[in-house]
Curated annotation (Swiss-Prot):
GO terms for biological process: CTP salvage; UMP salvage. PANTHER family: URIDINE KINASE. One of its GO terms (cellular component) is cytoplasm. Keywords: ATP-binding, Cytoplasm, Kinase, Nucleotide-binding, Transferase. The keyword Transmembrane does not apply. GO terms for molecular function: ATP binding; cytidine kinase activity; uridine kinase activity. It is an enzyme of class 2 (transferase). This is Uridine kinase. It is found in: Cytoplasm.
Amino acid sequence: MSEKSQCVIVGIAGASASGKSLIASTIYNELRAKVGDHQIGVITEDCYYNDQSHLSMEERVKTNYDHPNALDHDLLCEHLEKLMKGESVEVPEYSYTEHTRTENTTTMTPKKVIILEGILLLTDPRLRDLMHATVFMDTPLDICLLRRVKRDVEERGRTMESVLKQYQKTVRPMFMQFIEPSKQYADIIVPRGGKNRIAIDVLKAHIAKLLKA
C-alpha cells in the first residue's frame, strides 16, 4: 500500500497454530521500546468472527470457522480504516467456548504500528490493500496440528476428539482451499514457526523503515 497514513499495518497470516500469535507478540514486545508503549497494538482476526448469538449452541458448533464467510471482514476493514484516520474503535471480544461474541469490547486507540494476525487475512483483497506489509507463516501442517490439539484442549476447553474431527472436516480442507493459495500475496514467507529469529529481525527492520517513510 503506497498511500500515506497515520499508522503502519502489518498482516501476519498462516495456518491455525502456525506461530502467528507468537511472532506477533514477539515483535510487539520488542518494538514497544522504540515506538512507545502506547504506539503499537495487536488485533486478532478471531475477534471478528460473526456474532452468532441468535443461533443455538447446536447450530454454532456446526459453523465452518475456517471459511472466510465465518468472519466479519466488513467490520474489520471499517475499523482499520478508522484507525488509519486517527480514530478509536471498539474491537469485539469473541468467546471460543460460547462460539459467539460476548457483550464486551476492547477500545483500540490510534497507533503508529498495528500488527494484525489471523488465518484468512490474505484471502481478502480489501484487507491486503490496507496492509503495508504482509507475512505468511509457512509451518508444516503436522506441526500445526500438534500445537492446535495442545492449545485447544488446554486453553479452549475442547476435547481431543472434537479437535481432530474439526481438523479433518474443515481445518485442513479450508487450509488447502483458501489459506495456502493466499501465500502468494505475502511479502515475507516465514518458515519454522514463530521462533524464527532472522525473520523477526527482518520484520522489525522493515517496520522501522516504513515508520520513517
